[in-house]
Amino acid sequence: MSKTTASRAPRFAGKVVIVTGAAQGIGRGVAESIAAEGGTVFAVDRSPIVHEVVDAITAAGGEAAAHEADLETFAGAQGAVDQALKLFKRVDVLVNNVGGTIWTKPYDQYGEAEIEKEIRRSLFPTLWCCRAVLPFMVKKKKGVIVNVSSIATRSIHRVPYAAAKGGVNALTASIAMEQTGNGI
């Protein structure tokens, strides 16, 4: 360990962080890293595997809780935020990581239901979680929201996914501008 690393406090010490899509991949890595940096992790996913992630974090000495939810609905997002607030009394950081390409094919081969499913999976969880956590962050005039997007916003054979992640980029910029006076 370098002197710099050893001499500084963990970056997330004393912070409560909601991580969505925390059962695997990037979300799991983010949850584990935040816990290793002293953060309290509220890991959310629709997969029950999220409990295994939390078990691993707590076994390593971290503080974490798991919550299963369908974040494609506002009710699911609001329920997750409400549960985090009930358990930890606050949310300092929200990391939105839900999403992923379902199909890869030329755009003209997508059916209406497939397009809607891609948008629902890769845009709505971020949209709803931001909406659910904002009232709390606005009230305390402080908070951090990290929205994970993708370079695939400019790719072929994933047009609905690209559109959804482009929407995440627009949502991120708009919320940042709208909430700048609120410390978010």
Language-model segments: residues:
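Alpha-helical segment proximal to the catalytic Tyr-Lys
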Residues: P135, M177-G181
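Residue(s) in the substrate-gating loop at a strand-loop-helix junction
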Residues: S150
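Conserved mid-core segment of classical short-chain dehydrogenase/reductases
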Residues: K86, T101-E116, K139, H157-P160
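A glycine-rich helix->loop->beta "capping" turn
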Residues: A60-E63, Q83-L94, I102-W103
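Canonical Rossmann dinucleotide-binding motif of NAD(H)/NADP(H)-dependent dehydrogenases/reductases
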Residues: A9-F42
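Active-site helix of classical SDR
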Residues: C130, A164
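The beta1-alpha1 cofactor-binding region of Rossmann-like NAD(H)/NADP(H)-dependent oxidoreductases
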Residues: H51, E68-A80, E112
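Catalytic Tyr-X3-Lys loop
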Residues: D92, D108-L127, K142, V146, ...
